[in-house]
Amino acid sequence: TIENTIEHIVISGGGLTLFSYYGVLKKSAEKKIWDINNIKTIYGTSAGAILSVLLCLKYDWETSDNYIINRPWEKVFNINMYLLFDIFQRKGLFDLSVIKESLKPLFLGKDIDLNITFEDFFHVTNIELHLFVTDLNEFETIDVSYKTHPKWKVIGGEPLLLFGKAEARVKGVFFFP
């Protein structure tokens, strides 16, 4: 028989759909449809970026359940009307502190510095992480990985990018002014 080994995972954004994606990934892994040790690349954006980082870190499912299901997300993501009105002015839905707070337990649980670069993250996980961000000035998608932006921090990094005549800071996987 021909064995098909899954080596690549793609996770889209979609806010609360993160929970559905997580459930599908967990059940399919438990049924041995895929194995994290065979994964070479993971692609994610927005909420899918958070799940992508979780998978790269190879936590066991019980620990992952505790992070995804039992975490008081409402204390991390304070969504209100003003947040939605200011999305374009801020060039992002949440500021950097929210993203750091979201990923902090995952990094600290594996004794990984919150300032880790994409290059170092690859060497720690041995999985090629691709996170997609949008240049809101040019409306272009940017693929961020250790191959394209090795010195960028996975969360909270510089550098300052110039897009046309406007400036936008890229902070890890999200854009912030």
State each model region's role:
Residues G14, L114, A168-R169:
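Short linear sequence motifs
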Residues I2-E3, D135:
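Short, flexible turn/loop "capping" segments at secondary-structure junctions
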Residues E3-V10, G15-F107, T141-G164:
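Patatin-like phospholipase
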Residues L108-T125, P159:
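Short, structural beta-strand-to-alpha-helix junction motif
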Residues N80-Y82, I116-F121, F175-P177:
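Short coil/turn segments at secondary-structure boundaries
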